[in-house]
Regions:
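Substrate-binding/catalytic subdomain of NAD(P)-dependent oxidoreductase enzymes
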Residues: 42-43, 51-164
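Rossmann-like NAD(P)H-binding beta-loop-alpha module
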Residues: 2-59, 73-74, 81
Length: 189
């Protein structure tokens, strides 16, 4: 069960241990898709968005159909698991989605997707240049706070714990009654 979220990191056991010791989970913030983290770490002036998706597929980080990863469904499923373990009632339909690929890219064939996805490259490159100038990175973040859940692409600066997340790593921050000022962080593959 532990391997369902965070690539086998001790996230679920940690949440259970905190709760059983009398603590309460107040907020969960996490990067839970190694595939999406890989993609957003690879985008550069030389490697456009569409190419990073292809690279993730070639290196077997992504599903054979990368639209599954890009849809955020896997991250939503993982967030729901964590929320339930933390004592919250949550269904996948309750999670607010802020996706970065238009809905119409998810319909049609995989071949259709590969033909359309390069049309996103210019917009991603324009924004990437701004982020680079502002010393920020993209991260696809799952969040649970005050019983509300969301997933979406966020821009994080160098002061954020997610900024230096490399490769296909996962990271989770647990804010609890005990770890309020300095959230507990679990990071790795």
């Amino acid at each position: 069960f532990e391997t369902n979220v965070g690539a086998g990191l001790p996230i679920i056991n940690t949440i259970n241990d905190l709760i059983h010791s009398g603590d309460k989970i107040l907020k969960i913030e996490a990067v839970l898709s190694g595939t999406l983290n890989y993609i957003f770490n690879k985008i550069s002036a030389d490697i456009p968005f569409s190419r990073t998706i292809r690279m993730a597929q070639e290196e077997r980080y992504s599903e054979p159909d990368p639209r599954i990863d890009l849809s955020g469904k896997d991250v939503i499923r993982k967030l729901v698991i964590l929320a339930r373990e933390a004592g919250y009632r949550l269904e996948q339909e309750d999670v607010e989605k802020h996706l970065f690929v238009p809905d119409d890219f998810f319909s049609g064939t995989l071949e259709d997707f590969w033909k359309k996805v390069p049309t996103l490259d210019a917009d991603f490159e324009e924004r990437r240049q701004v982020l680079e100038a502002e010393h920020k990175h993209w991260r696809f973040v799952a969040r649970l706070e005050n019983g509300k859940a969301s997933v979406g692409l966020q821009e994080v600066d160098a002061s954020h714990p997610f900024y230096n997340l490399e490769g296909s790593n996962n990271i989770i921050l647990l804010t609890t009654e005990r770890y309020r000022e300095y959230p507990m962080m679990i990071q790795g593959y």
